[in-house]
Curated annotation (Swiss-Prot):
It comes from the Eukaryota. Pfam families: ubiquitin. Residues 1-76 form the Ubiquitin-like domain. PANTHER family: UBIQUITIN. This is Ubiquitin. The lineage of its organism: Eukaryota, Viridiplantae, Streptophyta, Embryophyta, Tracheophyta. The keyword Phosphoprotein does not apply. SUPFAM superfamilies: Ubiquitin-like. There is a cross-link at residue 76 (Glycyl lysine isopeptide (Gly-Lys) (interchain with K-? in acceptor proteins)).
Length: 76
């Protein structure tokens, strides 16, 4: 299924995923497309931050859902 990931810059990334994919998997796909390391990615859906070990199905994320990507920058 397709889902969309919207970045803070307003860019929308389209990903091909399965409901059984973990949030880790999704972050890896974002890394493939955008080059952003997963440890800097925070994914938000319906106001909740998504935890790595959970699946899209756990959060009831269905086709054509839009997730929001927030970058967590290190230290400073």
């Amino acid at each position: 299924m397709q889902i969309f990931v919207k970045t803070l810059t307003g860019k929308t990334i389209t990903l091909e995923v399965e409901s059984s994919d973990t949030i880790d998997n999704v972050k890896a796909k974002i890394q493939d497309k955008e080059g952003i390391p997963p440890d800097q990615q925070r994914l938000i859906f319906a106001g909740k931050q998504l935890e790595d070990g959970r699946t899209l199905a756990d959060y009831n994320i269905q086709k054509e859902s839009t997730l929001h990507l927030v970058l967590r920058l290190r230290g400073g």
